[in-house]
Protein backbone atom coordinates (compact mmCIF):
# COMPACT_ATOMS: atom_id res chain seq x y z
CA UNK A 1 0.00 0.00 0.00
CA UNK A 2 2.70 2.48 0.94
CA UNK A 3 4.48 1.93 -2.37
CA UNK A 4 1.32 2.24 -4.47
CA UNK A 5 0.00 5.37 -2.75
CA UNK A 6 2.57 7.77 -4.30
CA UNK A 7 1.97 6.21 -7.73
CA UNK A 8 -1.80 6.60 -7.36
CA UNK A 9 -1.41 10.23 -6.31
CA UNK A 10 0.95 10.92 -9.23
CA UNK A 11 -1.48 9.32 -11.69
CA UNK A 12 -4.38 11.28 -10.22
CA UNK A 13 -2.43 14.52 -10.55
CA UNK A 14 -1.41 13.66 -14.13
CA UNK A 15 -5.00 12.89 -15.14
CA UNK A 16 -6.26 16.10 -13.51
CA UNK A 17 -3.63 18.12 -15.39
CA UNK A 18 -5.02 16.68 -18.65
CA UNK A 19 -8.60 17.42 -17.51
CA UNK A 20 -9.48 13.70 -17.38
CA UNK A 21 -11.94 12.72 -14.66
CA UNK A 22 -12.76 9.18 -13.56
CA UNK A 23 -15.50 8.15 -11.17
CA UNK A 24 -17.40 5.04 -10.20
CA UNK A 25 -20.69 4.58 -8.41
CA UNK A 26 -22.63 1.55 -7.28
CA UNK A 27 -25.32 1.34 -9.95
CA UNK A 28 -27.00 -1.72 -8.44
CA UNK A 29 -26.48 -3.59 -5.20
CA UNK A 30 -28.65 -6.01 -3.26
CA UNK A 31 -31.55 -5.49 -5.66
CA UNK A 32 -31.54 -1.67 -5.43
CA UNK A 33 -30.70 0.56 -8.42
CA UNK A 34 -28.96 3.91 -7.95
CA UNK A 35 -29.72 6.81 -10.30
CA UNK A 36 -27.74 6.91 -13.54
CA UNK A 37 -25.25 9.68 -14.31
CA UNK A 38 -26.94 12.89 -15.52
CA UNK A 39 -24.69 15.85 -14.58
CA UNK A 40 -21.51 13.84 -14.98
CA UNK A 41 -18.85 16.37 -13.93
CA UNK A 42 -20.72 17.45 -10.78
CA UNK A 43 -21.55 13.87 -9.84
CA UNK A 44 -17.96 12.70 -10.36
CA UNK A 45 -16.75 15.41 -7.99
CA UNK A 46 -19.30 14.55 -5.30
CA UNK A 47 -18.74 10.77 -5.57
CA UNK A 48 -15.09 11.18 -4.62
CA UNK A 49 -16.17 12.74 -1.30
CA UNK A 50 -18.56 9.94 -0.32
CA UNK A 51 -17.83 6.91 1.86
CA UNK A 52 -20.51 4.91 -0.03
CA UNK A 53 -20.32 5.81 -3.72
CA UNK A 54 -23.89 6.37 -4.87
CA UNK A 55 -25.53 9.29 -6.65
CA UNK A 56 -28.82 9.02 -4.72
CA UNK A 57 -28.10 8.80 -0.98
CA UNK A 58 -31.57 7.39 -0.21
CA UNK A 59 -30.91 4.49 -2.59
CA UNK A 60 -27.53 4.04 -0.89
CA UNK A 61 -29.24 3.67 2.49
CA UNK A 62 -31.53 0.98 1.03
CA UNK A 63 -28.48 -0.83 -0.37
CA UNK A 64 -26.72 -0.72 3.00
CA UNK A 65 -29.84 -2.08 4.76
CA UNK A 66 -29.99 -5.00 2.29
CA UNK A 67 -26.24 -5.65 2.61
CA UNK A 68 -26.52 -5.71 6.41
CA UNK A 69 -29.55 -8.03 6.22
CA UNK A 70 -27.67 -10.48 3.99
CA UNK A 71 -24.62 -10.32 6.28
CA UNK A 72 -26.79 -10.99 9.36
CA UNK A 73 -28.05 -14.12 7.57
CA UNK A 74 -24.45 -15.19 6.84
CA UNK A 75 -24.74 -14.35 3.16
CA UNK A 76 -23.33 -11.81 0.69
CA UNK A 77 -24.57 -9.72 -2.22
CA UNK A 78 -23.28 -8.74 -5.65
CA UNK A 79 -23.78 -5.65 -7.71
CA UNK A 80 -23.01 -3.54 -10.74
CA UNK A 81 -20.44 -0.74 -10.77
CA UNK A 82 -20.73 2.03 -13.35
CA UNK A 83 -17.57 3.96 -14.22
CA UNK A 84 -17.41 7.11 -16.32
CA UNK A 85 -14.28 8.72 -17.76
CA UNK A 86 -14.56 12.26 -19.14
CA UNK A 87 -11.91 14.22 -21.03
CA UNK A 88 -10.41 11.13 -22.67
CA UNK A 89 -8.88 12.29 -25.97
CA UNK A 90 -10.24 11.10 -29.30
CA UNK A 91 -8.22 8.25 -30.82
CA UNK A 92 -7.22 6.13 -27.81
CA UNK A 93 -7.22 2.45 -28.78
CA UNK A 94 -6.78 0.34 -31.89
CA UNK A 95 -9.41 -1.02 -34.26
CA UNK A 96 -8.23 -4.65 -34.14
CA UNK A 97 -6.23 -6.45 -31.47
CA UNK A 98 -5.81 -3.61 -28.99
CA UNK A 99 -9.31 -2.14 -29.06
CA UNK A 100 -10.07 0.09 -26.10
CA UNK A 101 -12.84 -2.29 -25.03
CA UNK A 102 -10.51 -5.29 -25.29
CA UNK A 103 -7.68 -3.73 -23.30
CA UNK A 104 -10.00 -2.42 -20.56
CA UNK A 105 -11.95 -5.71 -20.40
CA UNK A 106 -8.71 -7.64 -20.03
CA UNK A 107 -7.75 -5.55 -17.03
CA UNK A 108 -11.21 -5.63 -15.48
CA UNK A 109 -11.60 -9.39 -15.87
CA UNK A 110 -8.28 -9.76 -14.04
CA UNK A 111 -10.25 -8.82 -10.91
CA UNK A 112 -11.60 -12.22 -9.77
CA UNK A 113 -15.00 -10.89 -8.61
CA UNK A 114 -15.79 -9.25 -11.98
CA UNK A 115 -18.04 -11.56 -14.00
CA UNK A 116 -19.35 -9.22 -16.67
CA UNK A 117 -18.27 -6.04 -18.46
CA UNK A 118 -20.28 -3.84 -20.81
CA UNK A 119 -19.69 -0.53 -22.54
CA UNK A 120 -22.43 2.02 -23.12
CA UNK A 121 -25.71 0.20 -23.72
CA UNK A 122 -23.86 -3.12 -23.58
CA UNK A 123 -26.25 -6.06 -23.62
CA UNK A 124 -29.23 -3.72 -24.12
CA UNK A 125 -28.04 -3.15 -27.70
CA UNK A 126 -29.25 -6.66 -28.57
CA UNK A 127 -32.81 -5.30 -28.39
CA UNK A 128 -32.13 -2.10 -30.35
CA UNK A 129 -32.33 -1.32 -34.04
CA UNK A 130 -29.23 -0.04 -35.80
CA UNK A 131 -30.91 3.33 -36.24
CA UNK A 132 -31.44 3.49 -32.46
CA UNK A 133 -27.99 2.24 -31.47
CA UNK A 134 -25.93 4.41 -33.82
CA UNK A 135 -24.57 7.54 -32.17
CA UNK A 136 -25.21 10.30 -34.70
CA UNK A 137 -22.56 13.03 -34.81
CA UNK A 138 -23.36 16.74 -34.64
CA UNK A 139 -21.65 20.08 -34.06
CA UNK A 140 -22.18 21.62 -30.62
CA UNK A 141 -20.47 24.97 -29.96
CA UNK A 142 -17.90 24.14 -32.63
CA UNK A 143 -17.12 20.67 -31.22
CA UNK A 144 -18.04 17.35 -32.80
CA UNK A 145 -20.12 15.32 -30.34
CA UNK A 146 -22.67 12.53 -30.55
CA UNK A 147 -26.39 13.03 -29.94
CA UNK A 148 -26.47 9.87 -27.81
CA UNK A 149 -23.75 7.82 -26.15
CA UNK A 150 -25.05 4.31 -26.72
CA UNK A 151 -21.57 3.04 -27.60
CA UNK A 152 -20.15 4.37 -24.35
CA UNK A 153 -17.59 6.71 -25.90
CA UNK A 154 -16.02 4.10 -28.20
CA UNK A 155 -16.46 3.49 -31.93
CA UNK A 156 -14.57 0.72 -33.70
CA UNK A 157 -12.32 0.13 -30.68
CA UNK A 158 -11.22 3.77 -30.50
CA UNK A 159 -12.33 6.55 -28.11
CA UNK A 160 -14.57 9.13 -29.78
CA UNK A 161 -14.32 11.97 -27.24
CA UNK A 162 -17.63 11.30 -25.52
CA UNK A 163 -17.70 10.06 -21.91
CA UNK A 164 -16.41 6.50 -21.62
CA UNK A 165 -19.09 4.44 -19.84
CA UNK A 166 -18.23 1.01 -18.41
CA UNK A 167 -20.35 -1.28 -16.25
CA UNK A 168 -18.95 -4.25 -14.30
CA UNK A 169 -20.99 -7.02 -12.72
CA UNK A 170 -19.43 -8.06 -9.42
CA UNK A 171 -20.38 -11.43 -7.94
CA UNK A 172 -21.26 -11.89 -4.27
CA UNK A 173 -18.21 -12.88 -2.26
CA UNK A 174 -18.10 -16.66 -1.84
CA UNK A 175 -16.61 -16.31 1.67
CA UNK A 176 -19.83 -16.57 3.64
CA UNK A 177 -20.77 -18.21 6.93
CA UNK A 178 -23.91 -19.88 5.59
CA UNK A 179 -23.59 -23.66 5.46
CA UNK A 180 -23.12 -25.03 1.93
CA UNK A 181 -22.49 -28.38 0.28
CA UNK A 182 -18.95 -29.44 -0.56
CA UNK A 183 -16.87 -32.57 -1.18
CA UNK A 184 -14.58 -34.50 1.16
CA UNK A 185 -11.63 -35.14 -1.17
CA UNK A 186 -9.99 -37.74 1.09
CA UNK A 187 -13.07 -39.93 1.56
CA UNK A 188 -14.51 -39.08 -1.88
CA UNK A 189 -17.97 -38.21 -0.59
CA UNK A 190 -20.39 -35.31 -0.53
CA UNK A 191 -20.65 -33.41 2.72
Predicted regions and their residues:
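Glycine-rich, mobile lid/loop segments that gate access to catalytic sites or pores
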Residues: 1-96
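Glycine-rich anion/phosphate-binding loop at the beta-strand->alpha-helix junction
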Residues: 5, 73-190
Amino acid sequence: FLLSLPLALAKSSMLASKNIKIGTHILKCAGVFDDSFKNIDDELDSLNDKAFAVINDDKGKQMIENIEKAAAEGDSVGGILETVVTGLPVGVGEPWFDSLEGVLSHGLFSIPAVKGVEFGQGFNCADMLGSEMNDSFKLDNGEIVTETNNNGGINGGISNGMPLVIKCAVKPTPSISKEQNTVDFINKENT
